[in-house]
Amino acid sequence: MSERLPQRREVHPEERVRNIWERERDTWQWTSIRVPEEILQRWLAMLRSGRNRNKVYREMQKWMSIHPKAPVIRPCGCRLCNPGWET
């Protein structure tokens, strides 16, 4: 018997970009309601400058891996509920 390796399906470049945005959005939604206020404000300040987006995303992923069972400490992580967004 010869076993065949599972075939990877072709991923269209537009789909790859969409998946990146969805993954970033999901990461933000999970962490923004769980991280302490100081960390959230630091991330928001870094995002305001615009060049630190990847660094913030990596820090969010690292925080998620270190604190997988972090409790929800704020009801929402949106711009209206977080004064650090400056909207």
UniProtKB/Swiss-Prot annotation:
Locus of motif Nuclear localization signal: 48-55
Annotated compartments: Virion; Host nucleus
Alphabetized InterPro entries for the sequence: Lentiviral_Vpr-like
Gene Ontology CC: one annotated term: host cell nucleus
Keywords on record: Cell cycle, Host nucleus, Virion
Main location: virion
Motif Nuclear export signal, residue range(s) on this chain: 40-47
Protein's job: Seems to function as a Vpr-like protein, since it mediates host cell cycle arrest in G2 phase. Cell cycle arrest creates a favorable environment for maximizing viral expression and production.
Name assigned to this protein: Probable Vpr-like protein
Source species of the chain: Caprine arthritis encephalitis virus (strain 63)
